[in-house]
Regions:
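Beta-strand-rich extracellular passenger or scaffold domains
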Residues: 1-214
Length: 214
């Protein structure tokens, strides 16, 4: 399929105060827009929108993707990570790998049609990916939306990652599982503050999972 547009920041480069609008694919089989920060690059104080897939095709088009790796930092940027527009399609994603850090950035993962935007951290045995002092809000649809079958936004801490001193809120809403934060093998909540919002009548509360050796 067709490749999406791509931005690459390397070797101490910074996005400064830019506005980055990364679009999800709207053609079946295509990739969404991508931005990559590597080798101590920083997102600066930019405003970044990471859109989910815009095409109605199960498992086909992809959402937009932002990747941080090799000591890259999200700086003080603001990220809006959207869910999919149609059932089973790809969501917007932001991922931190190796020794990258979310630093002082703010993230809002939003619910989609049936899957919300995704934020993930995964390091290696020699380098931990961390959330730094980030502010993370995993969103969920409100009861008024009438949606009862979708997943809210989510943050995942996978192998060799840590929430550090981040502030994380998992919103309540009428979704299948609510907004959620997940810790899996060899990850740690460390000194983070996590709030799981309580649901009103008909709502699902926010959820935090600790699995395996987390």
């Amino acid at each position: 399929g067709a490749a999406g547009g791509q931005l690459n920041f390397f070797a101490n480069a910074t996005a400064g105060n830019a506005t980055l609008d990364l679009r999800g694919a709207d053609v079946i089989g295509a990739q969404g827009g991508q931005a990559m920060f590597q080798n101590s690059a920083s997102a600066g104080h930019s405003n970044v929108t990471v859109q989910g897939s815009q095409a109605n095709n199960p498992g086909g088009p992809e959402g937009a993707l932002v990747t941080f790796g090799f000591n890259a930092s999200a700086g003080g940027a603001s990220f809006t990570v959207e869910g999919n527009r149609f059932a089973f399609a790809g969501t917007g994603r932001v991922q931190f790998t190796e020794a990258s850090s979310a630093a002082n950035a703010s993230f809002a993962t939003l619910a989609g049609y049936d899957a919300g935007g995704r934020l993930s951290f995964e390091g290696t045995a020699l380098s931990t990916a961390g959330a730094g002092n980030a502010h993370i809000t995993n969103g969920s649809r409100t009861t008024a939306s009438g949606s009862a079958g979708d997943f809210g936004g989510s943050t995942s801490f996978l192998a060799h990652s840590a929430a550090d001193h981040a502030s994380i809120v998992n919103d309540a809403g009428r979704t299948a599982f609510g907004a959620q934060t997940v810790f899996r093998a060899d990850s740690a909540a460390a000194g983070a503050t996590i709030v799981n919002a309580g649901g009103r009548a008909g709502d699902r509360g926010g959820i935090t999972f600790f699995q395996n050796t987390s």
